[in-house]
Amino acid sequence: MNSRTKALKITLIYPPGEQKISEPIPPPNMTIAVLAGALIESGHEAFQIDAEKDWFDKIQYSLTKKQTALLYDKDSVGAYVNGKAAKELAVKYDRIRTLLLNGLAVKKSDLVGITLVDIRAEPLIINFCALVAHAVKKEFKAKTVIGYRGLPKEGFFYLMRRYPCFDYGVYAHWGEKAILEIVNDISGEKAALTGTVARKNGKLRNYPGDGARRPYAPRPHYEDHILERYKADDARIFSSYNSDFPFAKKLIKKDKEFLVVPYAFELTCPGACAVCENDNKLRSDMKSTDQIIDELSKLKSRGVTGIYFVNSSFNNHYKTAEELCDKMIKYRLDLKWFDCANLRVMDERLLDKMRAAGAVKLTFGVETGSQRLLNYVNKGITVETARKYLEYSNKIGIWNHIELIAGFPTENARDIAATLRSMDNIKDFVDIYTLNPFYLYPYSRFYREQAKFGIKVVPYPPLQFMNFFYPLYRIVEQYSLKFEEIGGLSWEEKNAQIIGSTKAIAAKIDSIATFRAIGNEHLYLLMCLYDKLGHGNKELIRKLVRILTVKFKPYNLNFFMDDFRTSFSKQKDLRIFMPLKDTLFLGEPEPGAVPDVKL
């Protein structure tokens, strides 16, 4: 740390959201752990608050129904934090503010940071953040920062104009660097703010990103008190499922606690697929295998039994993946793990080593069953390759998860039919599906090389005129550019085709596996069953999972889900941004307004 900069006290908060994931027991958030690690290494004190867990475990029950209604009221919350609420209403919000601070056990801090990772356009997330930020400014005179690289700067301008309790908004790719510069700024030291919107002298100012990226994948610093809350024995795990059967009772031993945490060793990707925003010209941020083993060993020593890798892929580099597996086996890490796997860099030998090194579930980007489309998007695999390795992975006992995309540019009825046939051919080897309608992302190869792929992007008006927070519950970071197929479908026609393709593939998944198999990973359940029964009993594990997941209780619900007929609705997603002039923040269009989808 710069010797001129005094040590500050910084609190980092992961806020609650209603519709983030539906796991009965999710892993802890990695973002605040990464930021905390960087701050501690620079000599500051960092405190982590898992407000997501605090809210669903206890805080929500400390509020009356009227107080909960006020917390969800976007207009009243906005008036309160802007000092425009009527006196009687302000008193009510003061009480809520006190309940939140006490429930979260927020300490006096110089800076309070709230991550917006996974943000959806929902009142709970945004109002919670605004009320907490307002509270710490009132109680501690603290500065506040919100941040997430998935939200463009225009989104931060929008939020910070509505809520003056936010002092900084970080959209930089390298969040650790950005928050350290903010620390310098509030310390009165020279600061090179980067990828940050800052409130200066009552006005908002943008400090563009400098393009800097972290040299290596981030290292999380999880606090013990948070890890303790994510430990679960088999009894707790089974209690969230359809487990009132003799076989389940026989499996419960209460002799071990399970703990899954996120971790990454490579976020960059050498692939050149047209779909994602990856820039394969970037230098790899992969850690050395020795560093990975060292960091995983330290996590194990703290009670971690499973790793939820958030890499771009476990095996982007064959030799490195093989070396890592060999070391995981040699040093007897005995960690169960989950990760994405690259079909381009795969063979049976590597799959065997991944299994021996602890792989429980692998996610494969199959994308489509049309060889024409696989070639078109430069996926680098064949339909037969995907089938071959899915079959072998299943044979050796790995839980297979595939990702599919509906509505690629130029996709036609023959391509959809090929995908449906392929799904029939691999259904016996697949356990979980993820299905997404096609999004044309800014900075993807589709965007950068439009002529090559036979499309033409229809430009948006400037993003400052678009509503990032409409409709209600949209995933804020996910939006598609509109495009036309050159010599083919117009945007309106293509949009309808994407929706139709999504419906067709979703119906196929429902027919062969039911909607229960879409998206629900059941990390703790899988880790527990594989720990007890082993890879050699996958068929038994599959039967048990099918029975146990007939109903289950997500961590953020007070009831068991048992009707999954409407659980998949991505075909209804509004993938594009709508103009501010026609839409309400966190709501429906203005009365009488007709959003112009042809923009």
Please give the residue ranges for each predicted region.
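Radical SAM enzyme core and accessory elements
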Residues: M1-I13, Q19-S22, E41-E45, L101-D110, ...
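N-terminal [4Fe-4S]-dependent radical SAM core
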Residues: N2-R4, L8, Q19, G202-P262, ...
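Flexible glycine/acidic-rich beta-alpha junction loops that bind and position SAM and/or redox cofactors
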Residues: Q19-S22, D54-I59, L151-F157, G271, ...
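Glycine- and acidic-residue-enriched helix-capping/strand-helix junction motifs
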Residues: K20-I32
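Glycine-rich beta-alpha loop elements in corrinoid/cobalamin-binding modules
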Residues: T31, L35-A38, E45-A51, V91-P218
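Glycine-rich, highly charged phosphate/nucleotide-binding loops
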Residues: A69-L104
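Structural recognition of alpha->loop->beta junctions
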Residues: Y158-L180, K353-L362, A418-L440
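Radical SAM [4Fe-4S] cluster-binding motif and immediate context
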Residues: H225-N400, R421
